[in-house]
Curated annotation (Swiss-Prot):
Biased composition, class Low complexity, residue ranges: 506-515
Statement: the UniProt record of this protein carries the keyword Transcription: yes
This protein's name: Estrogen receptor beta
GO biological process: amygdala development; androgen receptor signaling pathway; behavioral fear response; brain development; cell population proliferation; cellular response to estradiol stimulus; cellular response to lipopolysaccharide; cellular response to magnetism
Annotated localization: Nucleus
Entry domain remark: Composed of three domains: a modulating N-terminal domain, a DNA-binding domain and a C-terminal ligand-binding domain.
Positions of the UniProt region annotated as Disordered: 506-530
Region (Modulating): 1-148
Family, similarity comment: Belongs to the nuclear hormone receptor family. NR3 subfamily.
Modification Phosphoserine, positions: 61, 87, 105
Domain NR LBD: 264-498
C-alpha cells in the first residue's frame, strides 16, 4: 500500500505562515486515509477519488488521473475522532470584517501563536446559551466584543434578516419590504451610508442592505418569539412528567434524560426533521470568477450557515443538557464536516455540480480560479457520487449529520470530576441517534443482512467526510493567511480554535516523544551500569 503524507500537514505554528501555506495543485490520484494520527494527517492511503468513480468528465489536461485501478479500504475507520486537545476559541475583533494577521517571519517563536489568538469563546457561548436573540449592546465590556452593522457600521443589536444589523437598519429594511420601497437616489446611486448619514438616501441604504445579504426570509427563525412558541409546543406528557418530578423532589437532568429515552426512534427522527435549518442565500459572484470573489462568497455563506448550525444543534434532543463548554467543543470539532455533508446532500441530485446555496451552483471547472480548491471539489463530487449510488434517503441524512456532531470529539470534554457524567450523557445521545438510523434503514424493507451492509456503507463514508473537512480547513487557513479574503467573526473563531488545537497537539506530541526518548535513554544507561 502506498504511503502519502499530506502536503499541508500541521506540525507547528510556523506551518501557517504565509510563506509556507501555499497548497500545491495536485493532478495525480487523490487519496483517502484509512487511519488518522492526531492532526498531522500521517496515514496510510489508497486510491479512491479518481475519474473511474466520478460521474463527470475530467479535462484532458488532467489525463494522468486516469491510471490505476480503484482500490477500496478493507478496514476503514468509522467515525474516527478528531485530535485530542482542543483549546480555547477566539473572540471577536472590533470590526465586522476581521482580516488575517500580517505576515510573520517563519523564524518566529512557537509560543507566539498563543499571543495572536484570544483565549475565550464569547460568541459561540453567547449563541449556545440563548443570547443570540436580538438584544442591545449596552455595557462597555460588551462593546469590545460587539458585532457591527455592515450597512451603517453602528453597533449591531442582533441577528436580523440574515445578517447582524442595528435596530435602525433592521426597522428600515422591515418597512421597505412591507410597504413603499420604490426609492430614487437624487445623486448617482453611490451615496455614503454610515451612522451619521444613513437617513440621507433611502435608495442607497436599501441597496446596501441587499448587498450585505439581508433577506426577507431570514428573520423569523432568529426571533425570540419563535423560540418561545416552539417551547410552548412541548407535549403535555413532558410537562406532566417534569411537574411530577418536581413534586417528588426528583432531579431535572435525570427527568430530561428520561424524556429522551422515552422518545421513539420515529419521534427522534421527526424532531431532527423539525430542527433542520433553512436554506441560506448568498449572491453568486459576477463573471468571470476571481479567487477573491469566489472565496468571498464561500466564506460569507459559511459564516451564515454557522449561525444556523448552532440553532440546529440546540434543537437536537438532549444536546442542551450537556455543559456549555461541551457544546462549544463539539461544535468546534465538527462544524466543517457538518457544512460539507450538507453540501453533499444538496448536490446529490445534481451530478457534476456543487449546490453551495440555491443561488450559488458551481461546476467542477469553475473552481480552477482558486488555487488548491480543485482537489477539494473533486473529493466532494466523488463522495457525493457515492452517496448517490447508495440512494441516501433524507431521514438517513438527518441521522448521519447528528451523529457527526455527537461523535466529533472523543477526548475528555468536561473537567476531571465531571468527565464520567459528561461521557455518559454524550454516549446516551449518540446511542439514541444510532438507534434512529437503524430504525430508518429497517423501515426500507430490505433484509437484515442488507440492513447491516447499508449501515456499514453509510458509516464508512464518514471517514471520507472527515478527510475532506481537514483538507478544506487547511485550504481556508491558507487563504486567510495570504489575505485573499476577509474572514468573518464566527468563522474566524472556529478557524482560530482549529489552529490552536493543532498547535497544542503538535506541542504535546513533541513533549511526549521527548519524554519517551529520555526514559529510553535512562533505561539503556541503567542496563549498561548493571
Amino acid at each position: 500500500m502506498e504511503i502519502k503524507n499530506s502536503p499541508s500537514s500541521l506540525s507547528s505554528p510556523a506551518s501557517y505562515n504565509c510563506s509556507q501555506s501555499i497548497l500545491p495543485l495536485e493532478h495525480g490520484p487523490i487519496y483517502i486515509p484509512s487511519s488518522y494520527v492526531d492532526n498531522r494527517h500521517e496515514y496510510s492511503a489508497m486510491t479512491f477519488y479518481s475519474p473511474a468513480v466520478m460521474n463527470y468528465s475530467v479535462p484532458g489536461s488532467t489525463s494522468n488521473l486516469d491510471g490505476g485501478p480503484v482500490r477500496l479500504s478493507t478496514s476503514p475507520n468509522v467515525l474516527w475522532p478528531t485530535s485530542g486537545h482542543l483549546s480555547p476559541l477566539a473572540t471577536h475583533c472590533q470590526s465586522s470584517l476581521l482580516y488575517a494577521e500580517p505576515q510573520k517571519s517563519p523564524w518566529c517563536e512557537a509560543r507566539s501563536l498563543e499571543h495572536t489568538l484570544p483565549v475565550n469563546r464569547e460568541t459561540l457561548k453567547r449563541k449556545l446559551s440563548g443570547s443570540s436573540c436580538a438584544s442591545p449592546v449596552t455595557s462597555p465590556n460588551a462593546k469590545r466584543d460587539a458585532h457591527f452593522c455592515p450597512v451603517c457600521s453602528d453597533y449591531a443589536s442582533g441577528y436580523h434578516y440574515g445578517v447582524w444589523s442595528c435596530e435602525g437598519c433592521k426597522a428600515f429594511f422591515k418597512r421597505s419590504i412591507q410597504g413603499h420601497n420604490d426609492y430614487i437616489c437624487p445623486a448617482t446611486n453611490q451615496c455614503t451610508i454610515d451612522k451619521n448619514r444613513r437617513k440621507s438616501c433611502q435608495a442607497c441604504r436599501l441597496r446596501k442592505c441587499y448587498e450585505v445579504g439581508m433577506v426577507k426570509c431570514g428573520s423569523r427563525r432568529e426571533r425570540c418569539g419563535y423560540r418561545i412558541v416552539r417551547r410552548q409546543r412541548s407535549s403535555s406528557e413532558q410537562v406532566h412528567c417534569l411537574s411530577k418530578a418536581k413534586r417528588n423532589g426528583g432531579h431535572a437532568p435525570r427527568v430530561k434524560e428520561l424524556l429522551l429515552s422515552t422518545l421513539s426512534p420515529e419521534q427522534l427522527v421527526l424532531t431532527l426533521l423539525e430542527a433542520e435549518p433553512p436554506n441560506v442565500l448568498v449572491s453568486r459572484p459576477s463573471m468571470p470568477f476571481t479567487e477573491a470573489s469566489m472565496m468571498m462568497s464561500l466564506t460569507k455563506l459559511a459564516d451564515k450557515e454557522l449561525v444556523h448550525m448552532i440553532g440546529w444543534a440546540k434543537k437536537i434532543p438532549g444536546f442542551v443538557e450537556l455543559s456549555l463548554l461541551d457544546q462549544v467543543r463539539l461544535l468546534e470539532s465538527c462544524w466543517m464536516e457538518v457544512l460539507m455533508v450538507g453540501l453533499m446532500w444538496r448536490s446529490i441530485d445534481h451530478p457534476g455540480k456543487l449546490i453551495f446555496a440555491p443561488d450559488l451552483v458551481l461546476d467542477r471547472d469553475e473552481g480552477k480560479c482558486v488555487e488548491g480548491i480543485l482537489e477539494i471539489f473533486d473529493m466532494l463530487l466523488a463522495t457525493t457520487s457515492r452517496f448517490r449510488e447508495l440512494k441516501l434517503q433524507h431521514k438517513e441524512y438527518l441521522c448521519v449529520k447528528a451523529m457527526i456532531l455527537l461523535n466529533s470529539s472523543m477526548y475528555p470534554l468536561a473537567s476531571a470530576n465531571q468527565e464520567a457524567e459528561s461521557s455518559r450523557k454524550l454516549t446516551h445521545l449518540l446511542n439514541a441517534v444510532t438507534d434512529a438510523l437503524v430504525w430508518v434503514i429497517a423501515k426500507s424493507g430490505i433484509s437484515s443482512q442488507q440492513q447491516s451492509v447499508r449501515l456499514a456503507n453509510l458509516l464508512m463514508l464518514l471517514s471520507h467526510v472527515r478527510h475532506i473537512s481537514n483538507k478544506g480547513m487547511e485550504h481556508l487557513l491558507s487563504m486567510k493567511c495570504k489575505n485573499v479574503v476577509p474572514v468573518y467573526d464566527l468563522l474566524l473563531e472556529m478557524l482560530n480554535a482549529h489552529t490552536l488545537r493543532g498547535y497544542k497537539s503538535s506541542i504535546s506530541g513533541s513533549e511526549c516523544s521527548s519524554t519517551e526518548d529520555s526514559k529510553n535513554k535512562e533505561s539503556s544507561q541503567n542496563l549498561q551500569s548493571q
